[in-house]
Amino acid sequence: MALGNCTTPTTFILSGLTDNPRLQMPLFMVFLAIYTITLLANLGLIALISVDFHLQTPMYIFLQNLSFTDAAYSTVITPKMLATFLEERRTISYVGCILQYFSFVLLTSSECLLLAVMAYDRYVAICKPLLYPAIMTKAVCWRLVEGLYSLAFLNSLVHTSGLLKLSFCSSNVVNHFFCDNSPLFQISSSSTTLNELLVFIFGSWFAMSSIITTPISYVFIILTVVRIRSKDGKYKAFSTCTSHLMAVSLFHGTVIFMYLRPVKLFSLDTDKIASLFYTVVIPMLNPLIYSWRNKEVKDALRRVIATNVWIH
């Protein structure tokens, strides 16, 4: 971990979102509220799916894992970001930075693959309804979940191993509110060409796995739905897909902007805003998107509330 007289720093300094002291406390309160809503919404959805047997279906198994990923995602990033609003010296240990980066890549990759699997699930449910119970069994669903987490883990391991080989001799100030690759590459004393290539190749594969799977699935879904004669049937089929399309668009639109482009094409301040959206805001929006117009989730919530009221 040394290069000549250069030794790896024991800590990094995070620049945070802003240096304006007047904005520190208002931003702290805003993002604390967002983080609280994120945890309550995602953990609440996980609990609801767990206790209501009507939601023990493949679609909700994947949604439960998406909620877990979003809650973990937000927890990896937000608490440290909140601390930067309150601390004068915004430090994170070298080990803490590496662990944060590893967790961040793991969860980002997991979400990409989860969205792809959810698109395939909707395709089978709508285009092959009679075969759906046989194809998407609980065992198959959990194997898919285990497989995507394993792939995400390997992806994160590759990127983190590359990061561990970099030296940071000239600066330890990370111009960001968390340890992401772009600001770390900016202050590296070593060549980051291989790292940037790995980010592009692996990032493209994980993003495209979802970006390609989703449109292909929805082409077949649309072709199937237009043949449905009843308006109620068409509405029910499309209503289960709308939430997924919104989640995919929000997540991948930001990720493509962030990672599938040359690192120096935009300023780090622009990256901060984009990062803020998909690491803090999207994890809050996802459970709301999937629950807002979802009759099954609303009915399950009513049953749970009614049961608790009756018991008490």
UniProtKB/Swiss-Prot annotation:
Signal peptide: none annotated. It is a multi-pass membrane protein. Residues 50-57, 121-139, 227-239, 293-312 are cytoplasmic. One of its GO terms (cellular component) is plasma membrane. SUPFAM superfamilies: Family A G protein-coupled receptor-like (SSF81321). Residues 1-26, 80-100, 165-205, 261-271 are extracellular. Disulfide bonds join 97-179. It is found in: Cell membrane. Keywords: Cell membrane, Disulfide bond, G-protein coupled receptor, Glycoprotein, Membrane, Olfaction, Receptor, Sensory transduction, Transducer, Transmembrane, Transmembrane helix. Its main location: membrane. GO terms for molecular function: G protein-coupled receptor activity; odorant binding; olfactory receptor activity. CDD domains: 7tmA_OR5D-like. Glycans are attached at residue 5. The chain crosses the membrane at residues 27-49, 58-79, 101-120, 140-164, 206-226, 240-260, 272-292. PANTHER family: OLFACTORY RECEPTOR. Odorant receptor. Belongs to the G-protein coupled receptor 1 family. This is Olfactory receptor-like protein COR5. It comes from Gallus gallus.
